[in-house]
């Protein structure tokens, strides 16, 4: 499985909408979402429309309109979003649980390749179907706070000057430098970065 650009942008936008909700922002404009992650606006609008049709986000029109999550973040599973945008998680059709397609193998039940790909599918699904958007938002905010990164999408008080935000790319570079400077060891591939968000590890 390879996440497409469309799938990547969908997840990044949802994470930002989740962060905005935690920051008590009611709505986020498409242009703001695009700017925060340096994404093309027109392409992002198409992705948000697909998410809206699935009920994952909702929008409000008007001068002060924008997007917000259509469901609680703890009910939006990452695997659901990936399947919606990119299709089945399975690397080959004959092991898919949601879009099965017979393969050309004459003996599917005893096909070694299929057995291997079942394990691959289960490993991918086991991670993407375990975590919700709320989980990813939580660890993102925890790590940003730990590394003193300016939090995006803070609710603005009327009349107050908006706080300057660090551009997404620069923030990621600063974060990488902090992590490398304090790293003591690497996370085991079987443990997962999400479980070690407060530890010292390399992303």
Tell where the protein language model's regions lie, with residue ranges.
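Short, hydrophobic-biased segments on the C-terminal half of alpha helices
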Residues: 48-49
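Short amphipathic alpha-helical interface segments
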Residues: 10-24
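A short alpha-helical element within helix-turn-helix/winged-helix DNA-binding domains
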Residues: 27-38
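Non-DNA-binding regulatory cores of transcription-related proteins
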Residues: 72-158, 162-203
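Alpha-helical residues within the helix-turn-helix
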Residues: 35, 52-53
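Beta-hairpin "wing" of winged helix-turn-helix
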Residues: 55-70
